[in-house]
């Protein structure tokens, strides 16, 4: 067994011990049938859902649209829509579940990101205690500061928050939409609206 696996097992054991204590404080019997393995399951789930805190950020795979050194001045917009994500609200540690849409403007160098790498960035920053408003900012910064050096980045988050779904106001319909702008998208309303139109039109097309 590798050292990291040993460390992970110790974490699982320590978290599980505390979950048992919480169950007892709630008036439950952690030794009853149905709950015996719950503390360990919860510990593993929490570690999985916060894995972004303990792993390095993913590196973006770069592809070139043109020949090396060729200037690419077409201002192409790349849109990655409907990236499913889930995170844990840092206020109540309840799930946030929704979709992220990422748009970026290709730089003059013609560098674009590998499709799956954008998804990995979304997963990385959502795998921690989080708020949605910060999540879209972190994703936007990660892409804007990456090797593809885009002219602009726009990240849209749309999600339901279980902290308001199952407790408090218990609203089953409310969703939170948050948007982060970088580069040309920050001041160009026409570009912003263009992305929203792309999303709207894409939702009307059934590709599969």
From Swiss-Prot:
Catalytic activity, reaction form: GTP + H2O = 7,8-dihydroneopterin 3'-triphosphate + formate + H(+)
Assembly and oligomerization: Toroid-shaped homodecamer, composed of two pentamers of five dimers.
GO biological process: one-carbon metabolic process; tetrahydrobiopterin biosynthetic process; tetrahydrofolate biosynthetic process
SUPFAM superfamilies linked to this entry: Tetrahydrobiopterin biosynthesis enzymes-like
UniProt-recorded name of the protein: GTP cyclohydrolase 1
Organism: Saccharolobus solfataricus (strain ATCC 35092 / DSM 1617 / JCM 11322 / P2) (Sulfolobus solfataricus)
Source organism phylogeny: Archaea, Thermoproteota, Thermoprotei, Sulfolobales, Sulfolobaceae
Chain's gene name: folE
Family as reported in the entry's similarity comment: Belongs to the GTP cyclohydrolase I family.
EC number(s) given by UniProt: 3.5.4.16
An example Gene Ontology molecular-function term: GTP binding
Source organism, top-level taxon: Archaea
Metabolic or biological pathway: Cofactor biosynthesis; 7,8-dihydroneopterin triphosphate biosynthesis; 7,8-dihydroneopterin triphosphate from GTP: step 1/1
Pfam families, per the entry: GTP_cyclohydroI
Keywords on record: GTP-binding, Hydrolase, Metal-binding, Nucleotide-binding, One-carbon metabolism, Zinc
Ranges in coiled-coil conformation: none
Recorded GO CC terms: cytoplasm
Entries under Gene3D superfamilies matching the protein: 1.10.286.10, 3.30.1130.10
Record-listed Zn(2+) binding positions: 89, 92, 163
């Amino acid at each position: 067994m590798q050292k990291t696996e040993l460390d992970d097992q110790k974490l699982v054991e320590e978290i599980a011990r505390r979950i048992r204590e919480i169950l007892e404080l709630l008036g439950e019997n952690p030794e009853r049938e149905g709950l015996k393995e719950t503390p360990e399951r919860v510990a593993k789930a929490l570690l999985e859902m916060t894995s972004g805190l303990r792993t390095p950020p993913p590196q973006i795979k770069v592809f070139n649209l043109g020949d090396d050194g060729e200037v690419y001045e077409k201002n192409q917009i790349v849109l990655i829509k409907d990236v499913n994500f889930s995170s844990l609200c840092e206020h109540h540690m309840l799930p946030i579940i929704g979709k992220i849409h990422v748009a970026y403007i290709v730089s003059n160098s013609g560098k674009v990101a590998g499709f799956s790498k954008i998804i990995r960035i979304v997963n990385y920053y959502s795998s921690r205690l989080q708020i949605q408003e910060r999540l879209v900012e972190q994703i936007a910064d990660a892409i804007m500061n990456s090797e593809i050096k885009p002219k602009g980045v726009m990240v849209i988050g749309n999600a339901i928050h279980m902290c308001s779904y199952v407790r408090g106001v218990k609203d089953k319909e409310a969703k939170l939409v948050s948007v982060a702008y970088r580069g040309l998208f920050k001041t160009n309303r026409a570009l912003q609206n263009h992305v929203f139109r792309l999303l709207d039109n894409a939702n009307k097309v059934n590709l599969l």
